């Protein structure tokens, strides 16, 4: 039995299937950990959702920002962006079944000596605290008032965590940290403005996994979200979004021995160049 963590798929169904063949995925024995952003921007979001739904006994996943965007739009919140490719899900006969299942997926999980979250964790959060905070969001998404909850997700504030945060501000910051974060300011505030490579980052920003005094050290964190970072593997951070959608690759990391498998996504590079993405 092997556990394979796979980075952001974002509707790139054909590369996903090719990657499963490359790793010789055996659904009778193996498990997939998906870092979130199953959907959007790629051409086959519906096919990805259907496959994961049909194989949910072999899959563990966390929600990403594009997954949450799909859920919000499906309930009439948020705006369809020019590059969104979620109409196939919204118009599908089985769309409601898939969306009801999707919104009940976790924000974070822990197991086999690892934790997984889409974007990252604040340095002051321990793993156990982060799991409790994730449950607060999961309760809102899966509860009877989930529509109200989805309608309040959008926004970039607040930017600084305190345990005294309550209500919408508290939940929005948890969501933004776990699904959108890349950088913090050097005094610990969430910064969502810069999305590029490490080398080009403003001097006042630090990548979340290099923030000082991180309290979640010791448990390796599997994450995605940051395609400009690419694959970044060190002792306790396993970032595996290698930018398939943008013509990079789709990557799988076998957690048992840290072997990396990458499938080039050249066709998507050509699409990106043609569309100016």
From Swiss-Prot:
GO terms for molecular function: bis(5'-nucleosyl)-tetraphosphatase (symmetrical) activity. Disulfide bonds: none annotated. Its EC number is 3.6.1.41. It holds the Pfam family Metallophos. Keywords: Hydrolase. InterPro entries: ApaH (IPR004617), Calcineurin-like_PHP_ApaH (IPR004843), Metallo-depent_PP-like (IPR029052). It catalyses: P(1),P(4)-bis(5'-adenosyl) tetraphosphate + H2O = 2 ADP + 2 H(+). Hydrolyzes diadenosine 5',5'''-P1,P4-tetraphosphate to yield ADP. HAMAP family: ApaH (MF_00199). Belongs to the Ap4A hydrolase family. This is Bis(5'-nucleosyl)-tetraphosphatase, symmetrical. It comes from Chromobacterium violaceum (strain ATCC 12472 / DSM 30191 / JCM 1249 / CCUG 213 / NBRC 12614 / NCIMB 9131 / NCTC 9757 / MK). The gene is apaH.
